[in-house]
Amino acid sequence: MPHYRRILLKLSGEALLGDGQYGIAANTLDRIADELAEINAMGVEVAVVIGGGNIFRGAGLAASGMDRVTADHMGMLATVMNALAIQDALERRSVFCRVMSAIKINQVCEDYIRRRAVRHLEKGRVVIFAAGTGNPFFTTDSAASLRAVEVGAELLLKGTKVDGVYSSDPVRDPEAKRYQQLTYDEVLSKRLEVMDATAIVLCRDQAMRIMVFDITSPGTMVAAARGEPVGTVVDPGLPSAQEESS
């Protein structure tokens, strides 16, 4: 039996890279689609927010002089491309799926309307939210927090390249400690790289539970949807974080 009724998965665009430096790796896309299809078959209602960093990173060009709003709009379009790729992969697995965009591009996908999104989820369709919040200066992490709250998700799953939240970069620091559980305020005060501060504050204010897990580890996403203890949990929780050795 699934542990959660409705979840939202936040994927960075880089999660689709695989071993490449740019674009979408077919084998990585297929693995993620397989796991999403398995979760959907369990009866869990699944929403997805996808980034676009595998195709375009606006921050770099903005730092080089491009107008920030223009750069962010280009990044939004990159997320639409990724969303369409995931939709196609799911439909090839006979999973009903809808892409909903925060910016109008309705010859390609639906406009985001909250009530319609909830109805799609209730009908068992996977819903992929594209184009972030539709506003510049907001990250796709903030979009994930916002959409999770709006559609009433019980869990926000944040897929990363490591198996949880660490006290420092575990690649560079062999002494880094992995947290099993954190509160929202601990994430903010310790400046831990879970999500940006705007996203964390929204989750805190709405008591949206976050689970950070390793998206590159096959089966971990499904295990998280079953309620198994994977990665790091961020919630109102305990007043002090629990750590374990990396």
Swiss-Prot record:
Enzyme class, UniProt record, top EC level: transferase
Assigned GO CC terms: cytosol
InterPro entries in alphabetical order: AceGlu_kinase-like_sf, Asp/Glu/Uridylate_kinase, Uridylate_kinase, Uridylate_kinase_bac
EC number(s) from the headed UniProt entry: 2.7.4.22
Residues that bind UMP: 52, 72, 133-140
Pfam families: AA_kinase (PF00696)
Keyword Nucleotide-binding among UniProt keywords: yes
Known regulation of activity: Inhibited by UTP.
Binding site for ATP: 10-13, 53, 57, 160, 166, 169
Pathway: Pyrimidine metabolism; CTP biosynthesis via de novo pathway; UDP from UMP (UMPK route): step 1/1
Subcellular location(s) of the protein: Cytoplasm
One BP term from GO: UDP biosynthetic process
CDD domains, per database record: AAK_UMPK-PyrH-Ec (cd04254)
Keyword Transferase: yes
Reactions catalysed according to its record: UMP + ATP = UDP + ADP
Keywords associated with the record: ATP-binding, Cytoplasm, Kinase, Nucleotide-binding, Pyrimidine biosynthesis, Transferase
The family this protein is said to belong to: Belongs to the UMP kinase family.
Subunit structure: Homohexamer.
Function: Catalyzes the reversible phosphorylation of UMP to UDP.
Name of the protein: Uridylate kinase
Natural source organism: Halorhodospira halophila (strain DSM 244 / SL1)
Gene this protein is translated from: pyrH
